Swiss-Prot record:
This is Ankyrin repeat domain-containing protein 34C. Belongs to the ANKRD34 family. Keywords: ANK repeat, Phosphoprotein, Repeat. Residues 159-181, 214-237, 381-444 are annotated as: Disordered. Pfam families: Ank_2 (PF12796). The modification Phosphoserine is found at S301, S447. It comes from Homo sapiens (Human). ANK repeats lie at residues 10-39, 43-80, 84-114, 118-147. PANTHER family: ANK_REP_REGION DOMAIN-CONTAINING PROTEIN (PTHR24156), ANKYRIN REPEAT DOMAIN 34C (PTHR24156:SF6). GO terms for cellular component: pi-body. Residues 216-225 have a biased composition (Polar residues).
Length: 535
């Protein structure tokens, strides 16, 4: 800031000195003589700034407003800042130059928003100087430029503390006593969410949606789970919380309501209960769907130590030698041949394969119609009559009587065995007739794979009745040298084969009905083709 020492202020600048003394004629002569109007001293102060700062008054000096007006008319820049960042407008507000000087500066382009190095603008300095005229001109200038001015002043209350007041279109801050103190620290479990139901009144306040409960939340969760229409998962969780032991709640830690170990134990109990419930449901379903069966002599019927017993049908077909039979009948015939030994119990699997041939006969063996009525009795007679077993089959247990065997032979199994044994007498002199299907072969039936022996489960099929001769000679176990019959071999490929028995000759002449567990589409087509050939 300049002082009264003109020599120090002007630094030999005649223009600044003439302005400082308020000599209008001298200033005009200097400017007309070529002096630079925006020239500054070592502090960066220009002639316009000096005119706003000076307070020198004598008989030859003029007023500040006239000097400022003359300098502005000669294109003095009002927005030049000195080294401290202050403009001529800021200096006029600090020195309280008056409203007229401020108005002249604003009319000639002075910017009231420019700030100095401390971040204060002309508005701040006008407020601090308590110059109401200058402040009024500044506010009018800001509004004219479309700027909204907010003035913030500090005041001291009666207690000596500073308070803040706001003006100009800004709502005042609420008083301290009007502010609601925040509620006590609450955990998420303390907050009860209520949905507006259909039966609730329309005049219910919004404050009721979120309510804080002062007591322990775990003690009332059971009642909330019963009353509110929440989701099933939420009800289960609330009931689980109700069953847990009450823990002491700390004032400093409102969130630790339940220990993790208690939650883990409760979760394990719920899982065990859920698993037991599932087991009960499965057990009840199994009791309804699956009837109990009689006792079996061997429980693990599929446990075989010989892995070679289970061959696929394709492997068996590849082992059959080539014969003179036609290709179409031969492939299906070779696929359907297999030996079937007598089994002592249902649920057992033969270990060795039976090797026996087919006796000679003609196509006239299929002449008599079959009947479903006598099949069950025939199978029962086969099981109870004593006689030698096939060479490589499992023998009957000697300790079991006829009544025990009757229990083990159910009606739905006898239908299948009767239909299979009734076809053992169909002749074939082809060299491939010496090999028949082993009992352990698997065949696709319906939607699953079943064993083609007495452990397989059968249902009455829908095959048309065929004519069968029930009095053929005993099958010869040696290979036959007679020429093969294409018709008989074709019949064997389309009809399932039953296990052979040496007691077949002693059976009474009865009508047999050929049955199959289930039929595939290809086999049904072959049967229809065979019926056309027979007709």
């Amino acid at each position: 800031m300049m002082d009264d020492d003109t020599e120090l202020r002007t630094d030999g600048n005649s223009l600044l000195k003439a302005v400082w003394l308020g000599r209008l004629r001298l200033t005009r002569l200097l400017l007309e003589g070529g002096a630079y109007i925006n020239e500054s001293n070592d502090k960066g102060e220009t002639a316009l700034m000096v005119a706003c700062i000076t307070k020198h008054v004598d008989q030859q000096s003029i007023s500040k407003s006239k000097m400022v007006k003359y300098l502005l008319d000669n294109r003095a820049d009002p927005n030049i800042q000195d080294k401290s960042g202050k403009t001529a407008l800021i200096h006029a507000c600090i020195r309280r130059a008056g409203g007229e000087v401020v108005s002249l500066l604003l009319e000639n382009g002075a910017d009231p928003s420019l700030e100095d190095r401390t971040g204060a603008s002309a508005l701040v300095y006008a407020i601090n100087a308590d110059d109401k005229d200058a402040l009024k001109h500044l506010l009018d200038a800001c509004k004219a430029k479309g700027k909204e001015v907010i003035i913030i002043t500090t005041d001291k209350s009666s207690s000596g503390t500073k308070t803040t007041k706001q003006y100009l279109n800004v709502p005042p801050s609420p008083k301290v006593e009007d502010r609601h103190s925040p509620p006590l620290c609450a955990s998420p479990s303390d907050i009860e969410l209520k949905a507006l139901g259909l039966d609730s009144p329309l005049t219910e306040k919004e404050d009721d949606f979120f309510s804080l409960q002062a007591g322990h939340p775990s003690s009332c969760n059971t009642s909330k789970a019963v009353n509110e229409p929440g989701s099933p998962t939420r009800k289960v969780s609330n009931l689980k919380r109700a069953r847990l032991p009450q823990l002491k709640r700390l004032q400093s830690e409102p969130w630790g309501l339940i220990a993790p170990s208690v939650l883990a134990a409760s979760t394990r109990q719920d899982e065990t209960h859920g698993a037991s419930t599932d087991n009960e449901v499965i057990k009840s379903i199994s009791d309804i769907s699956f009837p109990k069966r009689g006792p079996l002599s061997r429980t693990n019927s599929i446990d075989s130590k010989d892995p070679t017993l289970f061959h696929t049908v394709t492997e068996q077909v590849l082992k059959i030698p080539v014969s003179s039979a036609p290709a179409s009948w031969k492939a299906a015939y070779e696929k359907g041949q297999a030996p079937h030994p007598r089994l002592a119990r249902r649920g057992t699997l033969p270990v060795d394969q039976e090797k026996c041939g087919m006796g000679p006969s003609g196509p006239s063996a299929l002449k008599e119609p079959a009947s479903l009525k006598w099949l069950e009795n025939d199978l029962y007679d086969l099981d109870i009559q004593p006689g030698p077993d096939p060479p490589n089959s499992i023998s009957l247990e000697s300790g079991k009587g006829p009544l025990d065997r009757k229990k083990l032979n159910s009606s739905h199994l006898s239908l299948f065995h009767g239909s299979r044994e009734s076809l053992d007498t169909v002749p074939s002199t082809s060299p491939s007739s010496a090999r028949r299907r082993p009992p352990h072969l698997l065949e696709r039936r319906g939607s699953g794979t079943l064993l083609l022996d007495r452990i397989s489960h059968t249902r009455p099929g829908f095959l048309p009745p065929l004519n069968v001769n029930l009095n053929p000679p005993i099958p010869d176990i040696r290979s036959s040298s007679k020429p093969s019959c294409s018709l008989a071999s074709g019949l064997k490929s389309m009809v399932p084969v039953a296990p052979s028995s040496p007691k077949r000759v002693d059976l009474r002449s009865k009508k047999k009905l050929l049955r199959r567990h289930s039929m595939q589409i290809e086999q049904m087509k072959q049967l229809s083709d065979f019926e056309e050939i027979m007709t």
